[in-house]
Swiss-Prot record:
InterPro entries associated with the record: FabA_FabZ (IPR013114), FabZ (IPR010084), HotDog_dom_sf (IPR029069)
GO biological process, one term: fatty acid biosynthetic process
NCBIfam families per UniProt: fabZ, PRK00006.1
Species name: Prochlorococcus marinus (strain MIT 9215)
Gene: fabZ
Active site (UniProt): H58
Localization, UniProt: Cytoplasm
Protein name: 3-hydroxyacyl-[acyl-carrier-protein] dehydratase FabZ
Gene Ontology MF terms: (3R)-hydroxyacyl-[acyl-carrier-protein] dehydratase activity
Record lineage: Bacteria, Bacillati, Cyanobacteriota, Cyanophyceae, Synechococcales
Amino acid sequence: MEKKLSSENNQLSSEQILGLLPHRYPFALVDKVIEHIPGERAVAIKNVTINEPQFQGHFPERPLMPGVLIVESMAQVGGIIVTQMPDLPKGLFVFAGINNVKFRKPVLPGDQLIISCELLSIKRQRFGKVKGEAHVDGKLVCAGELMFSLVN
């Protein structure tokens, strides 16, 4: 069954995202896609709340979103781009690597992470590279390149 986009500015609801990505609670880290050009780029929102399980241990006295989860949220937005490539075989694309990731500022409960990803390249119809950035209140908090691989 082909997955259809919302007609509203190529946005994706949380239900549509769940139809594209295999991630589920507590690892579904994209709440809404607010801009989407299939196979090219996407901009998404991750609302960071104190109710998320990682804040029980990271850190109880001063909760911070773990950097690996910021990168994972960028990877999930990148995964939305890669899964929508019309010429690629259908299957499970997994996170295969990162390059030049830098963390600039902490992300706290109550923040809204705005994640932008853009496709950089596809090789041999099974490897993809995406440039990702995450912002809070217009300030860059994390950026880097993310790689994906198609698993048979």
